[in-house]
Amino acid sequence: VILDNQIQIAHNAIIGENTAIAGCTVVAGSAEIGKNCTIAGMVAINGHMKIHDGSVFTGMSMVTKPTKAAGVYSSGIPAQPNRDWHKMNAHIRKLPSVNAKIKQLEQEVAQLKSSAEDK
C-alpha cells in the first residue's frame, strides 16, 4: 500500500495490497478498497463502500455508492464510470450552441403559429 500525505482513514477501513492513495483523500469508516486500486487526490469515499480490485478514481471523485465492477471512475458527485463522464462533458461543451438553436427554433415556431392564426 502506498499512502501520500494528508490522508484520513477512518475506523475499520480495509485497503488491499498494491493500492495507492494520493493526498487529501478521505476514507470513511468500514470502507473496503480492493487490491491494485489507484485513488487520486481529494477523493472522498463514504463509509461501508466496497471498491473492486483494480479500480481507479480520478481526482476529486466522491464515492457515494459501491462500485459494480472494476474500472476508471471520474470527477463528480457521485463518481461515475469514466466513459459516461466524458460523454456528459462533451454534451456540456455543446450547450451554448444547442441553447442558441433552441431559441431560433422557438422563434420559428412562434412565427409559424402567428402566420397560421392570421389566415
Where are these regions (language model features)?
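Structural signal for interior beta-strand "rungs" in well-ordered beta-sheet cores
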Residues: 1-81
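Long, leucine- and charge-enriched amphipathic alpha-helices
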Residues: 80-119
